Structures are given as C-alpha cells and as structure tokens.
C-alpha cells in the first residue's frame, strides 16, 4: 500500500506551482512587466493631458463669463465714454452696458491668432446683430475657422441708427481685446446682409479708424452704396481703399437686383476701392453659404 505523504507548500522562494495547483507567493506578487509599466505610463499621461485641456477650457472667459471652445457666449460689457457718446446720438438713452455675443470654433485657443467676423444686421423687423450671427453666418464661419462677434444694446434702441450700431459693435470688440491679450492684432472682416450690407459701409471704416486690422467687407443683397459715404465721413486713411470688398448677389433677388448691386460696385470703384469681387448664386434675397465660404477664404488669402 502506498504511503501517504503530506503536501509540501513552500513560501519565500520561487517554487513554481505547488502540487495543489496553487501558485507560490512569489508568483502571486510578481513584479510588473515592462508592458504593464508602459500601459500605466500612457494612462497617466492621458489623464494629465485631459485634465490640462479641461482646465484650460474652463478658464476661458469672455467679458467675465466662462465658456468652452465651440460654444456661443453672451456677456454684458461696458461702454467707453466715446461709445456712450455715439450711443446717445438721435436721442437714445445710454444703456448701462452693451450685449456682446462671441462664437468660437471647437479648437479655439486664444494664444493663437484668429480671424474675426464682425456681424452687422438690418434694423428692419427689429433684428439685432446677434440674430444674423446665429441665423446666417455661424455655421459656415466656424467651419472655416473664424471667430464670430456681434455687439448690440441690452434692449432695442429707440433710434436704431448707424451711431448706435457703431458704439455697440465697438464695445464688443473692446471686450474681445480685454478678454484675450494680443487679440487687438487679430484680423477682422465685417459682414452685412440687406440693410446690414448698408450699415457695414459705416461700421467697417469706423473699426479701421479705431485701430482694428480690417481685412475684408462682405456684402449680400446691398442695393445702395454706403461704403463710399462711410469712407468719406470717417476718414480711416487711404490704406482702407485696399480693403477687399466681396459682393454676393442672388440671381432671383427682387429686393436688391443684380443690376442694382453691379451699380453699387461701380460707385465703390469710382471712390477708389481697388480689390472688389462679385459672386452670384442661384437664389433670392438671402445669405448664401457657399458665397460666405468663398468670401472668407478670399479675405484670408489676401491677408497673408
């Protein structure tokens, strides 16, 4: 008869699996392999990177209002004495602040330079600049890598005149410059549709007169030339005549016909503007996304 022997389990040395199939203590607490260390290192670095990005995004503020890249933020921003004097023209009560709206691409990093599209809307139907930003320009502008900006009063103006639009827009631009150091050097283009295409004729030279680097004016459905008058009144300097001007005209536009818009182009040429381009599209009195994309890319190309 075979003699029974006790099962021997050894600890403290590399004995390999025991006769019971249970690993030894050294196997159970074996040192991690190089692969495990690399995986752990990658996970740690990933967590640090994510935390850094999240912290940077959370620290972004526009006019003291926190926001994340890829979002649209609205902030109440102060008016300078000059902006208050403009706002008061036409008998308007001066508001305590302006309402500035900023839309940024998902990869927005304020330490880099960004082109800024400043929006001018018509005053018809009580539209505000921020309305046109959201309805007509935001999707294409962000996809093309632009920051979009609009300035309005906190309420509708009693007399929604050019001076009012200039003051509120400049307040938004000032807020941009205060929020992001170095942004005073960012290139700016101005866009206006219908009545906004007329108003932009004053807002663009006004911004240039006040030190902004204006690289383009984009007009859609404008049947009158106000840019020549804006240039004469505001006197931003002869260099402003080199600003690229892009006209977008719908074939079926009955409010601003192609004939009228080509006539406006002729007037602007006679004023002395040198870089003028007109694009047409199948459509009526509307902002065309493809034309917006062409205009923005043209401005950036010429600004290089």
Residue ranges with predicted function:
Residues 53-114, 206, 263-266, 276, ...:
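A domain-start/cap signature at the N-terminus of enzymes
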Residues 186-239:
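Primarily recognizes the serine-hydrolase "nucleophile elbow" in alpha/beta-hydrolase
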Residues 106-113, 158-195, 208:
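Gly/Ser-rich "nucleophile elbow"/oxyanion-hole loop immediately N-terminal to the catalytic nucleophile
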Residues 4, 10, 15-20, 27-36:
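Short, low-complexity intrinsically disordered segments enriched in A/P/G/S/L with frequent Arg
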Residues 116, 120-172:
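Active-site machinery of serine-nucleophile hydrolases
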Residues 216, 221-292:
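The feature captures the conserved acid-bearing segment of alpha/beta-hydrolase catalytic domains
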Residues 38-50:
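Bacterial N-terminal signal peptides
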């Amino acid at each position: 008869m075979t003699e029974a022997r006790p099962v021997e389990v050894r600890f403290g040395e590399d004995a390999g699996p025991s006769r019971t199939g249970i690993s030894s203590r050294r196997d159970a607490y074996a040192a991690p392999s190089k692969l495990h260390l690399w995986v752990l290192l990658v996970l740690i670095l990933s967590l640090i990177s994510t935390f850094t990005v999240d912290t940077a995004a959370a620290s972004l503020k526009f006019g003291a209002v926190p926001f994340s890249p890829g979002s649209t933020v609205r902030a109440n921003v102060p008016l300078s004495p000059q902006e208050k004097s403009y706002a008061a023209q036409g008998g308007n009560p001066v508001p305590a602040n302006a309402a500035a709206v900023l839309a940024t691409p998902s990869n927005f990093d304020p330490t880099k330079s960004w082109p800024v599209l400043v929006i001018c809307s018509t005053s018809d139907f009580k539209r505000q600049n921020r309305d046109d930003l959201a309805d007509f320009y935001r999707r294409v502008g962000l996809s093309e890598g632009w920051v979009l900006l609009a300035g309005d009063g906190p309420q509708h103006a009693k007399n929604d005149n050019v001076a009012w639009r200039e003051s509120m827009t400049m307040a938004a631009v000032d807020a941009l410059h205060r929020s992001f150091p170095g942004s005073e050097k960012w290139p700016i283009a101005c866009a206006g549709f219908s009545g906004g295409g007329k108003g932009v004729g004053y807002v663009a030279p006004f911004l240039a007169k006040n030190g902004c680097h204006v690289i383009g004016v984009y007009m859609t459905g404008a049947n009158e030339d106000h840019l020549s008058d804006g240039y004469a009144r505001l006197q931003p300097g002869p260099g402003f005549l080199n600003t690229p001007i892009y006209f977008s005209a719908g074939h079926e536009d009955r409010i601003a016909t192609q004939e009228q818009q080509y006539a406006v182009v002729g007037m602007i040429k006679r004023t002395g503007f040198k870089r003028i381009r007109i694009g047409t599209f199948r459509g009526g009195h509307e902002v065309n996304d493809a034309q917006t994309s062409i205009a923005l890319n043209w401005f950036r190309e010429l600004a290089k």
